[in-house]
Amino acid sequence: MSMTTLVILRFAGIFAAYTGLTVLLPAIMFRRILVGRGLSEQFLMCYTFGNFYIINIVFAVQLLHISGLWALVLFTAVPGILIWSRVNRVSLRELCIKTGIICKKILQGSMGMRGALYRVCNRIKAVLKRSVRLFYYKVICNTLQWILVGAVIIALFWIYGRNLLLTYGYCASDIPVHLNWINEMVRGNLFSDGVYPFGFHCMIYYLHTVFRVDTYAILCVFYLVQVFFIHMVLLAVMKLLCRSLYLPYAGVLVYILGNLWAKQTYSRFGASLP
């Protein structure tokens, strides 16, 4: 496998993991609250909560000195399930009883595997139908806006993404310092050299511990994940503030493509820094 392919696959995996934690997980937890809101508002609500959720989970398990794979998974899953059931008004007790009855019927032979699979397939079909309907109303009915979103993403990857393939390294001299902080968190030392580990360190530590990706490898590619979401948040905020449908896209494109400010304004976008 070539280095370029490895870097692309590594970036795709980290991007998917981070997106799942900060966008998809909150979207599932707060589905009932999010229904009826605009896509920009939904994204900002999910992304803000998702980051704070993961960051505070890391702080909690680190301060309790129980940090590790299973502690992080449990502290993520259990509160997430409880919040999901409370927000979406789903009774966990009734859900467990129904699941237990189905399992009992399968074990007793009163319900065959074909019947169980039929129920599962019907549930999957219902989810797919809702997904197709949502895709139609959110994407197909707003084709021009999604074309502009694609233009923003292409510009973003053209300006910042090429560096991912051309430079195999940290791209900033102080990243080894942040690497040391995160490695100390792995050893259980949250504040090894003063009160410093902010959300960036907590998120990298979580990705390393739960998804088993080396910290140094995450730091080589995570900057592009950061840059992507920084500009998506900027776009979402502008869409909520502007009356014009297309001015936000023009503004973000000018910010990405225009060399309007000092070099230091853009230099931090080229490295995985807090």
Q: For the regions a protein language model found, what residue spans apply to each?
A:
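Membrane-embedded, hydrophobic transmembrane alpha-helices
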Residues: 1-136
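Alpha-helical transmembrane segments and their helix-start/interface "positive-inside/aromatic belt" motifs
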Residues: 139-151
